[in-house]
């Protein structure tokens, strides 16, 4: 398994707990678009930290906090309950940390994260709107993309409900 492979169980969990709710949330915040311009930005932190060891492959929940705060090793272990090896934190991780900290602090100060991104990369991150559905895929080289996990979001929102209607579960069935 290379570091870009993620298990189907992790994908399922990420969809149900993070991806689908995040997309639904930003859609709700931008429902008045274009009448009211969007000030909502969607970010997908796609990075595979070298300090994560064991079975965790990819950006685990709350691991982005290591890029946002100056936390020591003991604090990190309290914040991120995953096996880590702080000795694997290298220059790439430090550079990414400063990009992330700068971008988030710029967003907090101004409401627009682009000053934090444009000075450190070549992307222009537009606010989310229901038509373009833009988001920032944040990694060593940030990239603006559209329709976060679109196929999987459509699976959960359209295909699975359709299947449930087509193939209802018979509660009286002895096979259950």
PLM regions and their residue ranges:
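Intrinsically disordered, low-complexity, compositionally biased regions/tails
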Residues: 14, 115, 120-123, 154, ...
